[in-house]
Amino acid sequence: MKYVYLFSEGNKDMRNLLGGKGANLAEMTKLGLPVPQGFTITTEACTRYYEDGEKINDEIQTEIFENIKKMEEITGKKFGDKENPLLVSVRSGARASMPGMMDTILNLGLNEDVVEVLAKKSGNARWAWDCYRRFIQMYSDVVMEVGKKYFETLIDEMKKKKGVTLDVELTADDLKELAEEFKAEYKSKVGSDFPTDPTEQLMGAVKAVFRSWDNPRANVYRRDNDIPYSWGTAVNVQMMAFGNMGDTSGTGVAFTRDPATGEKHLMGEFLMNAQGEDVVAGVRTPQPIDHLKDVMPEVYDEFVGICKKLEEHYHDMQDMEFTIEDKHLYMLQTRNGKRTAKAALKIACDLVDEGMITDKEAVMMIDPRNLDTLLHPAFDTEALKNAEEIGKGLAASPGAAAGEIVFTAEDAKTAKANGKKVVLVRLETSPEDIEGMKASEGILTVRGGMTSHAAVVARGMGTCCVSGCQEIIMDEENKTFTLGCKTFREFDEISIDGSTGKIYAGLIPKVDASITGEFGRIMAWADKYRRLRVRTNADTPKDALKARELGAEGIGLCRTEHMFFEKDRIAAIREMICSDTVEERENALAKIEPMQQKDFEALYEAMEDYSVTIRYLDPPLHEFVPTEEADIKLLAETQGKSVEQIKAIIAGLHEFNPMMGHRGCRLAVTFPEIAKMQTRAVIKAAIAVSKRKNIKIVPEIMIPLVGEVKELKYVKNIVCQTADEVLKKENFEMEYHVGTMIEIPRAALTADEIAKEADFFSFGTNDLTQMTFGFSRDDAGKFLGSYYDKKIYENDPFAKLDQKGVGKLVKMAATLGREANPDIHLGICGEHGGDPSSVEFCHNVGLDYVSCSPYRVPIARLAAAQAAIKAEN
């Protein structure tokens, strides 16, 4: 097996083996673009590294050094040589883009001897020592895990001592002194001298990149973005191009279109006399890319030509990294750029209009999960008129955020856990902050541009971000910042607008986003290709109308118990629970029936002639009884019972495992009068709206938690008998369907029997997951973190359908059900109905529809189209 490929040996179709970065470096080499040469160590080598107990075996090491020899032949330089040294960068490059998630080392191959020779030969001692101190810092941080902060402190102390504010103002002698301090810091932390042998440095760096595939921030990012652990990362070893050689050198990052809006213009930033990490890390605030034409017009023109060539070649917006070494341009990377959902839609539609791609390709270009961000609120325009604007940064990631100020990622996580909405304010963010960024409504940074870590990650997560607000004077130690003559402390309130970059004092109210234009076009294309229908889970007319606006084709799950918790209804439910006889229960239920009917009428009106599936009462009765002493006393008074009697009734409802207890169809078996009341309400509501609106309604009644066909038979008989009585009394003809949720493993295993009694199955994957795994959704959070760390699970099975186990049950039940009843309709109504990978699974096993929460309807529509296109290909 071949583990190492020169850039000249690969191409863009080898990304599974070479990773995205390696495949694209190979492709740019093939296109004849100026790429510093090098080689890629494959993802299979990474997998092998972990299989061999985190060791790089002799076979792979031999290949690495064979390719170092080939690089020496290409460049005319020699690795480890004092007189003509070959210096390299070592970078990660996974199959899927993971910006800032893994680690990079620059200037590898330097030591005391080499740096002295470089200083003499180049006549630029400052550059040579700057490269060396950077290398010591990166190697210490990435390979030996000595935190960056120790070195940053030494830099700050040196700048203070020399009376300068910027790194670039330090002289060669200052940097030489700093390099010595760095090595002393390394020795004090590691216990040995900084390595001088380039071979040792290289192998240490390669191992570190492989290790970084498994670091906590990469694991979090992978889970959030459906990137399997088994993929591994490739490693790219590339000849250094130096952007820090002086005023005719620089480095930058650019996009062929605006990643925030999708507008067709070159957007990016560059820094003179800097290395690539300076731009991405956001340590210095760079200049806009179009200023490059004033500084180096020829280099700018060459770069613009390359950008055009790359976009036309890849048929997508490109995100590129480049370095200028003494007026020579080098391309270090290209990839399909991360973009906001709004930009993704515009870019896809524009590329179709420009004739570059088809509508089918446009549908496949968009990550369905990102659509979520389009549907998020913006600030109320009237409220904005009176808002107090205190400053402005860069509009790094669109959206509106308002909340209490926190200064650390840890504080953001804690606040979120306590139900608070927060805005994370940082000098700059780093990959370690990712969990805190996820927990925040928005992110505000003092440093960094549109391509800084904060900006890129926030855009990917759909979180509002304002970056590079340099007017902020930050005091991290005391957790305060000053902006616009005002000092803000921890937990003070601010609002930030990621679409304009504006920052406001206080909380500004938000309004729902309105969706038009490109969104409609993409959704129309998606609807053209998808086979699965998309319904919504909705219990209120407001939710139902929102879902219809977003393209829902019916309600796949209406949870009737949610209607019982309103103040006027809970009293009647409690009266029913406390009743001693069937008559008393029926009297209590008679009070609820007109309320339920009214609720159902509102849903039927909202959905018109689309299907509405109504699930009968599901939760255990203990959820409806009071727990506070005052409420118990009040219930006793209204029921004409003593407090002790009520407490005895409540105690009698206690169950050791209520989620597997007296709930679902078991309630209807024990108290048939509940099912009768709900049936009357469903049918009467359907009749009333059919007459009023002159539409055909076919009610769908769903019996929950069936595990035995006889349960369904028993409850179905009650439903049909009651429905027929109502229809006869009203002298009205109406078709209605009775089906069940498949949410108990036994129901899936005996689906052929159950299908004979059911008009439809709806897979309740929340409970089916709980019962198949044998753990509770509410308690799993306590241990799932350890399971992720130990690679037992890669994803939360309640968020992403477990296709091996739970999925096998779904597939089996679908097959058995269809064999027994070819006319049966099959759907899914758990939270998984809005997860793209789960939607694809539903398409592949032949379900008829998925049902999800209103705001996830567009996600499901697009995911269903992508599933159909993939299956066709």
Q: Where are the model-predicted features located?
A:
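Nucleotide/phosphate-binding sheet-loop regions of phosphoryl- and nucleotidyl-transfer enzymes
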Residues: 1-387, 414-416, 420-423, 430-435, ...
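Short beta->alpha connector loops at strand-helix junctions that form conserved
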Residues: 39, 446-448, 467-470, 558, ...
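Conserved alpha/beta-domain cores
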Residues: 91-92, 515, 525-873
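Flexible inter-domain linker/hinge segments
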Residues: 206, 375-407, 521-527, 531-536, ...
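Structural motif
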Residues: 236, 406, 423-425, 444, ...
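Glycine-rich phosphate/ribose-binding loops and adjacent secondary-structure elements
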Residues: 328-330, 427-438, 442-444, 450-457, ...
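Extended, non-globular alpha-helical segments
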Residues: 392-432, 483-521
